[in-house]
Amino acid sequence: MAGRGKRKPRSLPQTETPNGEVKKAKEGLKDDKTSVGEEMREEVERLYKLRMPDDFFQFWDFCEGLNADCPQDALKNTLGLQLVGPFDILSKKHKNSSSQPNFHLHWRYFYDPPEFQTIIQGNADTQHHMGYFRDLPDALPVFIGENEAKKGYTITQLGDNIFAAVLLFLQKKKKEKRQQKDDAALNRLEEDLKREAERLGLPLEQKTKSMKQRERKVVTKTFHGAGIVVPVDKNDVGYRELPESDASLKKICKAIAEAKDDEERMKAFAPIQEMITFVQFANDECDYGMGYELGIDLFCYGSHYFFKVVRQLLPMAYNLLKRGLFGEILEAHLASRSQDNLDQLAAV
């Protein structure tokens, strides 16, 4: 095994806020005159403790135009998509719930890291879903991510707003579709999405300028592929690499998860224990990104054998990075990490 890990030189000094975030934060403060009133906006943010971007409310308006009776089902027949998560609050579904749900767990799939907030449910068989991805809990999302939880932990980036994400999904569906009977409906929806996004001034690229700027600040991709951003100063303080590559770390995880007995498992855990020691050194020297990376990777691997280590690493990293809400979300998720029971508002 390599030494204590080395700092990774960065071509550009980093700050806590990614490029473009200040501009987006200002945009989030203005009133774009959607049908969603201020009281309802505040309700969403109070229950989730997260600020919602304008495109969230604009997309609700768009879906109301498609299906006034049930905007959440506006994309169901054409795309097999349903608006969930914070959209349940706009539809007042939470008012009918007899229990007090934990919205940190509402539509939180097995592999969703704390940075991910589900907003759209897709194919239930693969547990396909889309959500906002935030680098900071008190900032606006940096992109829309897509995951299929039954297939693994990979997060695919689909633009920086819901219109772009749904359009990209639609265009992919059109390419894969063999039957032609619904093409007219898909074409009509495609044109409607493009027209409304243009009217609102929203970009429709899969990778926007702000997303490319963020990529320059990503210190490591992590297992899920979306990457993590931490502040790195001009002296490269903030992040140091793990002493294992992703491939070798996955082999270590596999050996632990598939060990035939406790003795073999304890032996296989030795490299992880050594890395935890390196993380402690890194934290002492303000390289908080190292523990963040290891914690996210072990969370992504998903084995219950890592839950204790993840609890040891990630809340500490989030606190050191002043991202405490993500630590709260993680704790709630690990206490109730399930492949099922995703809808916290479902009748029990």
From Swiss-Prot:
Assembly information from the UniProt record: Interacts with PARP1 (via the PARP catalytic domain). Interacts with PARP2 (via the PARP catalytic domain). Interacts with core nucleosomes in a parp1- and parp2-dependent manner.
Subcellular location: Chromosome; Nucleus
Protein name: Histone PARylation factor 1
Main function: Cofactor for serine ADP-ribosylation that confers serine specificity on parp1 and parp2 and plays a key role in DNA damage response. Initiates the repair of double-strand DNA breaks: recruited to DNA damage sites by parp1 and parp2 and switches the amino acid specificity of parp1 and parp2 from aspartate or glutamate to serine residues, licensing serine ADP-ribosylation of target proteins. Serine ADP-ribosylation of target proteins, such as histones, promotes decompaction of chromatin and the recruitment of repair factors leading to the reparation of DNA strand breaks.
Bias (Basic residues): 1-10
ATP-binding is among the record's keywords: no
Family annotation (InterPro entries): HPF1 (IPR019361)
Keywords: Chromosome, Coiled coil, DNA damage, DNA repair, Nucleus
Any coiled-coil regions, as ranges: 170-200
Tissue-by-tissue expression: In adult, mainly expressed in gonads.
GO biological process terms on file: DNA damage response; DNA repair-dependent chromatin remodeling; double-strand break repair
First-listed, main subcellular location of the protein, grouped into a coarse class: nucleus
Compositional bias per record (Basic and acidic residues), positions renumbered to this chain: 21-38
Reported phenotype of the disruption mutant: Morpholino knockdown of the protein causes malformation anbd delayed hatching.
